[in-house]
Regions:
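Multi-bladed beta-propeller domains
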Residues: 1-20, 46-73, 82-87, 98-115, ...
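Signature of short aromatic-glycine-proline-rich micro-motifs recurring in repeat-based ectodomains
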Residues: 18-29, 33
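A short loop-to-beta-strand structural motif that recurs across blades of beta-propeller domains
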Residues: 42-44, 94-96, 138-140
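Short, solvent-exposed loop/turn segments at conserved positions within beta-propeller repeat blades
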Residues: 36-41, 86-91, 132-135
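Residue-level detector of Asp-centered blade-edge/turn motifs that repeat once per structural unit
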Residues: 26-28, 71-74, 121-122
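Serine-hydrolase catalytic core recognition
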Residues: 114-268
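Residue position within the beta-strands of beta-propeller blades
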Residues: 30-34, 77-81, 126-129
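Beta-propeller blade termini and top-face loops
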Residues: 81, 91-94, 215-218
């Protein structure tokens, strides 16, 4: 048989093949495809008979993180994304559903925070646990009533005991990057016996390569090396600078053949 190209991805830098997703619909005439072709990781409907994009399903200055379920019977896609709410930390993961025609996108996890959810088989009920680096976890049982996600709180963490022992949450901060415009998001972890009148040595825990972002976005009462170093008398900083993931392809491409950059221009 004759080989025919159905979808082609190209880039003068690199293609993030590890983030690709495809789902061929029943009948074999259309396929849902994930791509960063417009700089942001989004979902497209591909016409397999013509070998062309039929329509862009998701769009905007934000990224699809993962496709959870394709409900062909109801023509709905369930997925996670970050950066949709411009007033929130762009790395926070939220859960969404959208019609295959690109209409009626609904947020299933409306509260601010980094979310992790577990759904029942037909996605009518789910347990959602969310938190931030500063805010303790809240667990909610949710269901969809029409187009709105309704929730009932099942559990909420109590920090009174660890706070009474001297524990303090890391400080979330933002600062403009090298372009003077794009906000960089990070955390500052101080010792539990921090004295604002004293000077402390600062250690930055750095990762500024492709493929991921490592600054904690969920609640971690003990954050490994970061907490240990802080308790030894250091102030520890973590920051996801240009070259890391989930802020668009141009943001990540800074690291292309340039790992020596390590995001330093965003830190100085």
């Amino acid at each position: 048989g004759k080989v025919r190209t159905l979808v082609e991805e190209s880039s003068p830098t690199f293609v993030n093949y590890s983030r690709m997703f495809r789902h061929v619909l029943k009948g074999g005439k259309e396929m849902i495809w994930m791509s960063e072709r417009d700089n942001w990781n989004h979902l497209y409907m591909i016409d397999l008979e013509k070998g062309k994009v039929a329509r862009q399903i998701t769009k905007g200055d934000w990224v699809v993180r993962r496709v959870l379920k394709v409900d062909e019977d109801n023509q709905v896609i369930y997925f996670t994304a970050s950066g949709v709410n411009p007033k929130e930390d762009p790395y926070h993961v939220h859960y969404y559903k959208i019609n295959m025609d690109g209409k009626q996108m609904t947020c299933l996890t409306p509260e601010e925070g980094n979310h992790s959810a577990v759904f029942n088989e037909d996605y009518t009920l789910w347990i959602d646990k969310y938190s931030t680096a500063e805010q303790a976890p809240v667990t909610v049982l949710r269901t969809t009533q029409g187009e709105k996600a309704e929730g009932r709180t099942l559990a909420q963490a109590d920090l009174s005991k660890i706070k009474s022992a001297g524990w303090t949450a890391p400080e979330i901060f933002t600062a403009p990057g090298r372009d003077g415009v794009t906000p960089m998001w990070g955390i500052i972890q101080r010792p539990t016996n921090f004295d604002p009148q004293k000077k402390y040595p600062v250690i930055e825990y750095i990762y500024s390569g492709p493929g991921d972002a490592y600054t904690p976005k969920s609640f971690l009462p003990y954050n490994g090396y970061t907490t240990a170093l802080a308790e030894l008398g250091f102030i520890v900083v973590q920051l996801d600078a240009m070259g890391t993931s989930y802020r668009g392809k141009k943001f990540e491409e800074v690291c292309y053949k340039n790992l020596k950059d390590a995001g330093f221009p965003d830190r100085i």
